[in-house]
Amino acid sequence: MAFFFPTEDLKTGEVMLRLTRTCEAQPEKGWVPAYYFDICLPDGTRIGECDLRIGHNGRLYIGGNIGYEIEEAYRGNRYAAKACELLFRQARKHGLEYVIITCDPSNRASARTCELAGGRYLETAEIPEDHDMFERGFRQVMVYRFEL
């Protein structure tokens, strides 16, 4: 657990991140260390989930450093963008100078979240056949870069 930093400060007046688990690096799979969180309102109500992967490699260019999902009843409130801002804070603790977030080209809401959170669109990339996202049916991702 020495690699992971405290997360109690990941909150604002609108959202907070509650750590659910961490995952050590698994180099044989191309996985970097990761944090997994519930996204919650200040009263503790769970409204979604997010994760932060620490590091950079070819697999993460496609999969991204950050993933998020907001429960349907809570969508439209910019909670994902607010959670991303908190994840950026955690990424800075690890010395990351930038993070990548990717989304399916058909997911306009996620692309909008990337724009609201300050991402710079880089490209729409083809997913390699050996990537786990390809196995799950995805073929392309929009790639956004966020300077930290």
Task: Describe every region a protein language model picked out.
Residues 34-36, 138-143:
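Short hydrophobic/aromatic beta-strand or adjacent loop that forms the aromatic wall/cage
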Residues 44, 78, 95, 107:
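Conserved G/P- and acidic residue-centered "switch" motifs that form tight phosphate/ATP-binding loops
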Residues 38, 51, 65, 69, ...:
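Conserved beta-strand segments that form the floor/walls of ligand-binding pockets within enzyme
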Residues 68-70, 76-93, 112-116:
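Conserved acetyl-CoA-binding loop-helix of GNAT-fold acetyltransferases
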Residues 91-102:
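Conserved GNAT acetyl-CoA-binding A-motif
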Residues 2-61:
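Acetyl-CoA-dependent GNAT
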Residues 102, 120-136:
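Conserved catalytic-core motifs of GNAT/GCN5-like acyltransferases
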